[in-house]
From Swiss-Prot:
Residues 1-73 are annotated as: RNA-binding and homodimerization. Upon interferon induction, ISGylated via host HERC5; this results in the impairment of NS1 interaction with RNA targets due to its inability to form homodimers and to interact with host EIF2AK2/PKR. One of its GO terms (biological process) is symbiont-mediated suppression of host gene expression. Belongs to the influenza A viruses NS1 family. This is Non-structural protein 1. GO terms for cellular component: host cell cytoplasm; host cell nucleus. It comes from Influenza A virus (strain A/Equine/New Market/1/1977 H7N7). The keyword Ubl conjugation applies. The dsRNA-binding region is required for suppression of RNA silencing. Homodimer. Interacts with host TRIM25 (via coiled coil); this interaction specifically inhibits TRIM25 multimerization and TRIM25-mediated RIGI CARD ubiquitination. Interacts with human EIF2AK2/PKR, CPSF4, IVNS1ABP and PABPN1. It is found in: Host nucleus; Host cytoplasm. The gene is NS.
Length: 230
């Protein structure tokens, strides 16, 4: 196993521990707490994949961070912060919408890259909107936290989420996953609309009304792809 992979995991575990202590003091805002929960799942998946104990890794990560801080001057820290591009966290969904339980009568699932797409293909003739929480850097989607499809009544009927065991995805990965989700939902004559935030940063091949256009042939192809890979 590559030593950089191990040390990276160890540092991530310790930094998550620090953020958790911060949150325990009720100092974190909603995006901070959201990322904390998502990163916890990711660390568990990575630990399982690497065969590493999280508690042991956290202690090792603490030693690495302490060593770095001992060598770090205040001036060097200022220069580092100034040179790092800042990402923004954008939220379409409230915490309630992100944590809302849902179940599928006709579950369909597809994994594309490091993203998992789930949808209920029992949903028919509904008006559906896609909402997402994600970070943006250089005016492009950086990291998808969670994307969900909602009916007008607020029911969750679809979802795109990163796989904890396979961290890392690109803007194109997200666009492809959105296309698959939309194709699957529109197969049953649902009308699918994309939020303005998603249109701007992650799904630009859409009409102004937020309803991406898919020819019938492409819709059928997408739906068959989902069914064949479940």
């Amino acid at each position: 196993m590559d030593s950089n992979t191990v040390s990276s995991f160890q540092v991530d575990c310790f930094l998550w521990h620090v953020r958790k202590r911060f949150a325990d003091q009720e100092l974190g805002d909603a995006p901070f707490l959201d990322r904390l929960r998502r990163d916890q799942k990711s660390l568990k998946g990575r630990g399982s994949t690497l065969g590493l104990d999280i508690e042991t890794a956290t202690h090792a990560g603490k030693q690495i961070v302490e060593r770095i801080l001992e060598e770090e001057s205040d001036e060097a820290l200022k220069m580092t912060i100034a040179s790092v591009p800042t990402s923004r966290y954008l939220t379409d969904m409230t915490l309630d919408e992100m944590s809302r339980d849902w179940f599928m009568l006709m579950p369909k699932q597809k994994v594309t890259g490091s993203l998992c797409i789930r949808m209920d293909q029992a949903i028919m003739d509904k008006n559906i909107i896609l909402k997402a929480n994600f970070s943006v850097i250089f005016e492009r989607l950086e990291t998808l936290i969670l994307l969900r499809a909602f009916t007008e009544e607020g029911a969750v009927v679809g979802e795109i989420s990163p796989l904890p065991s396979l961290p890392g995805h690109t803007n194109e990965d997200v666009k492809n996953a959105i296309g698959v989700l939309i194709g699957g939902l529109k197969w049953n004559d649902n009308t699918v609309r994309v939020s303005e935030t998603l249109q701007r940063f992650a799904w630009r091949s859409s009409h102004e009304n937020g309803r991406p256009s898919f020819p019938p042939k492409q819709k059928r192809k997408m739906a068959r792809t989902i069914e064949s890979e479940v």
